Amino acid sequence: MDSIIVSLRLVAATLLACVVGYTSVILGVAQLVPDTARGSLVTAADGTIAGSRLIAQKFEQPRYFWPRPSAAGKDGYDAMSAAGSNKSPTSADVAERAREIAARYGATGDRPLPAELAAASGGGLDPHISVRAALYQAGRVAAARGIEQEQVEALIEQQSFAPGGVLTRDRLVNVLELNLALDAR
């Protein structure tokens, strides 16, 4: 009988330590970085939550910058199904999708599409594109919004960052944040 009581006390102490103690410690540590702990949410100018800066969203209107293609989920951009397609780069499906995307962007031999705009990222939900890929789209976005292309290019530069600091050459832009900055103008 004594061993049962000791066992029950041990179970209760373990549950208390693991369920309450561990959870409280993790929650407390997360509060040191509250933005990240809450999913790195981005709010629009009107105060509504527009999305997360960590997950790509689908933008299809010409007035917005378009992210990399996504293979996550049936129609892409499904955060619950984040993954690449696992198809070979030599796959006929991948080649056909790349041709369709290049046509959508109006790519030509004189103006080839940056590869990242035709290929999904490994996780399928990469929220960033390179400044080069953003500049490729600047003309379309400016024309659709009725503003000067130089204004759009200046905003791209303003929104750009180097993810590795001085260790990286390529600058990136977050597509959601860039589109929200355009809407705020």
For the regions a protein language model found, what residue spans apply to each?
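A broad, structural surface signal
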Residues: D2, V6, A13-T14, L180
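Flexible, solvent-exposed loop/hinge segments and secondary-structure transition points
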Residues: D2, V6, V19, A30-Q137, ...
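Extracytoplasmic/periplasmic C-terminal soluble domains
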Residues: R140-R185
